[in-house]
Amino acid sequence: MEMTSGSLGNGIPEAMGQNRGNIKRCLEKYIENGRRVMKLNELMDEMEIVINDVTQRRRVMEGDLGKILCFTQAVVIPPNVAFAVRGTPGNWQYVKVNSSNLSVEALSSTQYLKLKEFLFDENWANDENALEVDFGALDFTLPWLSLSSSIGNGLSFVSSKLGGRLNDNPQSLVDYLLSLEHQGEKLMMNETLNTARKLEMSLILADVFLSELPKDTPFQAFELRFKECGFEKGWGESAGRVKETMRILSEILQAPDPQNIDRFFARVPRIFNVVIFSVHGYFGQTDVLGLPDTGGQVVYILDQVKALEDELLQRINSQGLNFKPQILVVTRLIPDAKKTKCNQELEPIFGTKYSNILRIPFVTENGILRRWVSRFDIYPYLERFTKDATTKILDILEGKPDLIIGNYTDGNLVASLMANKLGITQATIAHALEKTKYEDSDIKWKEFDPKYHFSSQFTADLISMNSADFIIASTYQEIAGSKERAGQYESHMSFTVPGLYRVVSGINVFDPRFNIAAPGADDSIYFPFTAQDRRFTKFYTSIDELLYSQSENDEHIGYLVDKKKPIIFSMARLDVVKNLTGLTEWYAKNKRLRDLVNLVIVGGFFDASKSKDREEISEIKKMHSLIEKYQLKGQFRWITAQTDRTRNGELYRSIADTRGAFVQPAHYEAFGLTVIEAMSCGLVTFATNQGGPAEIIVDGVSGFHIDPSNGEESSDKIADFFEKSGMDPDYWNMFSNEGLQRINECYTWKIYANKVINMGSTYSYWRHLNKDQKLAKQRYIHSFYNLQYRNLVKTIPILSDIPEPPPLPPKPLVKPSASKGSKRTQPRLSFRLFGA
């Protein structure tokens, strides 16, 4: 974003005159160590060294320069210091200050990025023909949100803009409705009503006819009469429902308004079959949680599918249709499945009637790849995977899906490729964008690439987020961060990968494609610990052994001497970002906390040789060293990753029985599903202030925020709570109850599913309206994919397996089917190993 009149940059010269001496010393301190990139904490720390007088420091901080320093990063190239200033979420300005004469110059984002590149690749920075990526140049005709507070409310914004478009061109809606069909059957309208005028007149006549019928008259009773007038099924299951829907459409055609547009598209029969991509890790329903690259995303999707199917069934019924929705979760088939079902091609999803997991293998020139592949090494296999998956999906669904949803970088890229090929509405869900998790991973990509292949990943992320018709985020912070920290998507607005490309405009967080839809927790598993009649008593004995047995075995090490103490508990993957070793070290160093509570950690393996994940191996070794260094046995229990979700629900409640707490200490957490699970069980929760948990928890009301970068402060905050709750039992109860209330009001899967299906319906029409611009953008993306992504992927080694015995002849694919009775409680189909 350019520096504009009235911006912070224009106030700096005056501030320089008022605080010239202090500011000059401050800037001289910044350039003292030569060229470098400085983060906010470094800027503030070095300013405090130079301006040690508290009054003078406050004067500087209250001025324009202080405003800059509080929300910025800087590039130091003596004698200049260039600042990237974040005034509000999504709004960035750039300014360069000369430390010698304090002159100020406004910069463009391109100029600022070039200065940053100068530190890492001077030749690239000076290359006038260096590749610049500017997706924003293709979106100039579309409307944008304007206020930071409105970010993530894209659907409401689109509905408001549709009103103007429909007022100017109602025929576009008529054409869209005429295109609706499913399984070869026309829906809502036929060609008899091919103009807006004809439709308006017919709606008036239909209203008169319907007013004479009892509201509960089934649609079938007047279906033939309606068909003669140009109306097909899909308006509703009864005369009353049909009349309501038609009146909403009549009002839209006469005077469109956002509320009626929302109501109408919520009733349009547009979404029946959904494909969800989640490629990496071990995607399954049992025995997978805690395996490499396998965690909350799997839980999220399985719960998501149940909610979406329930919502679709309810909608299809209210539309007066008898179609059955189908949802396919498409993932990788892994022949070496580690005692999981990840080597089964087709698997019904428990708790659903019409939803299945479809697994497609990775295929190389040597055949099917049998071994697990890290999410960082997955990119060479995705193009072939997309092709094979598309063939199977079209076969199973007997046609195209109506909506494709991608998950994480790999799933989003595959979803983008397939949606573009088939012309289908596409949504993306990031879960986590790795660029924000690894500091300076863009400008220092050459250091990271041999291990993480971030050049391929960042390129794939740019492709998928710009291909999507709408983007689902769990929280505002995921998109645009907080006052103190930029959001995951916000960090992709402009950045540079020196030597590859300079992103002038990667994504705009004011884009109306962004929508917040927070997931919930499965309430059949995660319910309050006080609901004694619902609790899973069959797990009591095994959980007691898990927590309190004095023996050490392959499932738990360490022990708890004082069983009367409350337990603080954390459960996550054992990697650097999740920070379980960080929590352990906080606890180990805080004597007061150790005296008050026990610590139980659930995650990973004990034996590093059992892990194939690079980060997990490192964290395993670190955890063992902490146990020995601080002599934690007696107050500490380390339990291996637990894959039984039902027992995990009871584990949360068992911790609540001790009047303990759940602690989520991640350096960054995009959403925080375990936070939702813990609070749903009535467990008092402390969670990171970096990411989604900061929105889930109202600090000091429904739980507590902790700072993962300040272990001493965080551990003291936990200790303070337990000291108070030890003196006043109602103090613990208050936070438990407030946490439950917060979940019930804001975080349920029913709310989520309703939002997502509404998005799918409305954005399908928005896509129809903007198809020419969509095509132009796809051509730009196609070039970027072919000229950049494909070449980057070639640098990633293709894995190979030890030669296996010749495969058995393939058998025909068994298509999914479901009985008309109750929902599945266990698999009922026979399966074969894909390609074997």
From Swiss-Prot:
Main subcellular location: secreted
GO cellular component, one term: extracellular region
GO molecular function, one term: sucrose synthase activity
Gene3D superfamilies (alphabetical): 1.20.120.1230, 3.10.450.330, Glycogen Phosphorylase B
Intracellular or extracellular location(s): Secreted, Cell wall
UniProt-annotated stretches for the region Disordered: 805-836
Protein name as annotated: Sucrose synthase 5
